[in-house]
């Protein structure tokens, strides 16, 4: 079946790109441009619909299978910008027998036709949604095959160890090198360490890929909303001397250097509250803190620390999150009496010190390490690591049959990172999150 979709962003622009893929893509394209197309050449062609009604003049490029993104015949029409002309071309191709592509269907066909593995497919989608320059660089390396090389190398090591083990099982009564199991253990331990390293790096720096989430936490009236407004450089949140003004979370995106960050202003946390609505807001605040990558823990520097301040400090410390302590209202007389390594700011005057502190931390998280770029990859790696750990314990007990069983489990999960077992439901779910023209 031939599929078609808009491959460029929806809306007004200088050009729109319509992508067509399938065994009959070339014939459908000829119906529109009325002249033959040479593969991999950019042709300027007039496009016509039924009854020779002129549609547009476009650049048409034909990619003959298998030398295309999907591995099938692909034709791309670069039309004048705007959605109307592109939709007219799509409508004509639908009339001729194509159908609208499902989200991610072009990439799914590329995967099924061996043009890319799942790691590359996922990295392309993640690169489109990259939240920072650091993330874009990591994902470009992943898309270029560095993660796939790592995974395949790890898989080869496990296969080698499994081959050693099965030799020991099959020829248990024969004279075999005395160090064969010792060598297997050393190889497996090395594989385990490499896998654990990439899992830990990927978990600790996940915000690089997904975008960091920062929660502003504190008791009422310490200036949390004022800090949000100051960072945004406009009045987004209502501020008031009345405690409990913020009842719900407010989320905005702000760019710090090369990083796009989600900042969440939250309701003030206190034990006594005026209504069930405020109580719900406080629970939302605590949940935002638990889900955040970074916490701005805000205090009023012009007042002595209250019991609520101390309780919030204890709550935050138990979360084991990156926390930037903020002493607000630095333009007033300093009275805060807890010793903290904190950033002094006056949200009313200038929040630049806080911006610089956050940007410095974000820059420190940039890495040259290979990273797993999706939750699916992290979970598969975790399961593989768990199986390898079990295998090492069994090897110490000389339980070779069970050791081989755990190795096979590890191999299955490692292999699933680049190419899972045939599971159409899994593939449909994964590719459905892609853009329509991808």
From Swiss-Prot:
Co-factor: note: Binds 1 potassium ion per subunit.
Annotated binding of GTP, by residue: 221-226, 240-246, 265-268
Cellular location(s): Cytoplasm
Enzyme class, spelled out: hydrolase
Domain of life per record: Bacteria
A GO CC term attached to the entry: cytosol
Annotated Mg(2+) binding sites: 225, 246
Cofactor names: K(+)
Function: Exhibits a very high intrinsic GTPase hydrolysis rate. Involved in the addition of a carboxymethylaminomethyl (cmnm) group at the wobble position (U34) of certain tRNAs, forming tRNA-cmnm(5)s(2)U34.
Similarity comment: family membership: Belongs to the TRAFAC class TrmE-Era-EngA-EngB-Septin-like GTPase superfamily. TrmE GTPase family.
Protein name: tRNA modification GTPase MnmE
């Amino acid at each position: 079946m031939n599929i078609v979709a808009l491959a460029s962003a929806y809306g007004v622009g200088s050009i729109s790109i319509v992508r067509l893929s399938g065994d009959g893509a070339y014939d459908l394209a000829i119906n529109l441009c009325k002249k033959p197309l040479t593969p991999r050449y950019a042709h300027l062609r007039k496009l016509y619909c039924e009854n020779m009604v002129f549609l547009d003049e476009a650049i048409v490029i034909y990619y003959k299978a298998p030398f295309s993104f999907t591995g099938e015949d692909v034709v791309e029409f670069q039309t004048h910008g705007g959605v109307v002309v592109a939709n007219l071309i799509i409508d004509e191709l639908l009339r001729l027998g194509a159908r609208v592509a499902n989200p991610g269907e072009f990439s799914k066909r590329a995967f099924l036709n061996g043009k890319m593995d799942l790691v590359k497919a996922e990295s392309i989608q993640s690169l489109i949604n990259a939240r920072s320059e650091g993330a874009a660089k990591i994902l470009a390396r992943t898309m270029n095959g560095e993660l796939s090389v790592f995974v395949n190398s790890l898989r080869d090591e496990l296969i080698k160890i499994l081959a050693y083990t099965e030799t020991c099982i099959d020829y248990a009564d024969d004279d075999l090198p005395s160090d064969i199991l010792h060598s297997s253990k050393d190889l497996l331990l090395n594989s385990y360490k490499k896998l654990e390293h990439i899992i830990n790096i990927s978990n600790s720096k996940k915000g690089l890929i997904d975008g960091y989430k920062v929660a502003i936490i504190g008791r009422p009236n310490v200036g949390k909303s004022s800090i949000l407004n100051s960072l945004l450089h406009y009045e987004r949140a209502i501020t008031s001397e009345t405690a409990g003004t913020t009842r719900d979370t407010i989320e905005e995106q702000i760019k710090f250097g090369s990083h796009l960050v989600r900042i969440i202003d939250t309701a003030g946390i206190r034990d006594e509250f005026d209504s069930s609505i405020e109580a719900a807001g406080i629970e939302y605040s605590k949940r935002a803190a638990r889900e955040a990558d970074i916490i701005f823990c805000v205090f009023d520097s012009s007042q002595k620390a209250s019991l609520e301040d101390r309780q919030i400090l204890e709550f935050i410390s138990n979360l084991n999150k990156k926390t930037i302590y903020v002493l607000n209202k630095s333009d007033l007389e300093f009275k805060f009496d807890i010793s903290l390594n904190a950033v002094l700011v006056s949200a009313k005057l200038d929040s630049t010190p806080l911006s610089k502190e956050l940007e410095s931390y974000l820059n420190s998280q940039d890495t040259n390490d290979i990273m797993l770029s999706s939750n699916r990859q992290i979970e598969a790696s975790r399961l593989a690591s768990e199986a390898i750990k079990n295998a090492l314990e069994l090897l110490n007990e000389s339980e070779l049959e069970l050791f081989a069983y755990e190795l096979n489990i590890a191999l299955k999960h490692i292999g699933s990172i680049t190419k899972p077992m045939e599971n159409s439901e899994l593939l449909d779910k994964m590719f459905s999150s892609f853009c329509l023209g991808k």
